[in-house]
């Protein structure tokens, strides 16, 4: 990695931490703010969460094309300004219409940030350094969310609207500060308008859908996000309250255990993951999460003490965190390596769209099941976890050797005396 790319990468990581820190201030308290503090009711609060998802689903198909044509930086800056306006609007909104409008702006801006930042990371990294770069991104995101949520919890007061206005103002300020930091980034290999592939949007999507490995990875990604991330604050938390009988403070401890596991284990796990086949790492995560669901089943359906049940439930979240730490240096870099030259933005946006779909469907399916159908809920998501293992092994058969084992590219370059050879580059983009 050149010095210029290294400097750009450091600023991108600072930006990731700032955005996560700002989101951590408000995300845990959004429902309480809309429903109780503003007095708009549970229905409006639920609609706010739905608007977040709908806004993301609307803008993401266009975001990828914009990143390819304009480059990730202009798209990121536009997303940050939009998110800042939405965050500030939420802090000042007093009516349902104003809250929903601001939520749409915040949701759209927040959704577009993900593929734009991911594409900037791709532009500033090489095949062999990409896993570490995405692991650092995930680490800083979780650290920022955790610290932001902790500080926000001490600043917020449910009896004072002004305390929430302060939180949303801080979030908006973080987005604007991130925009300032990102505006100084100079990405040496950032795509230019003239360099982008000259094809229609329909042609770009047709090309993506013609990539069998990318299609299989998208299906696998949907199951990953549906069976894990889509359950954290819906089905699994409902199961914990209704079946396990845990308190809200214990649920908070479980979420903290998840974040702590990621922060503590990320770089230790990275050393192991970097030398393994990506498909097998994802398959191992499926087995690990299957164990997590078994532990969750014991917590709610077993006949142990309440203390044992609570400990098992907290352990479930920690096991999920370990799996997340294994996935962060694996899945996102694989998306980038599957993308043809100049198409990373399109592929990142498509995968972000899959993620949003899974996060929208996951709570809708898991929430009611976790609250009332306890045994079927555990069995269903245990099977989904085993399905992850099957899909990952099947994906491995579609990947080239370099896509599945990126360190091979570096080894081949060394074998050739340090000069990159054509077949390696071609294989990495197959």
Model region roles, listed by residue range:
Residues 39, 71, 92-97, 299-300:
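Helix-breaking motifs and short loop linkers at transmembrane-helix boundaries and internal kinks
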Residues 102-141:
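Cytoplasmic helix-loop-helix junction between adjacent transmembrane helices
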Residues 74-89, 280-296:
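Structural signature of the two symmetry-related core transmembrane helices
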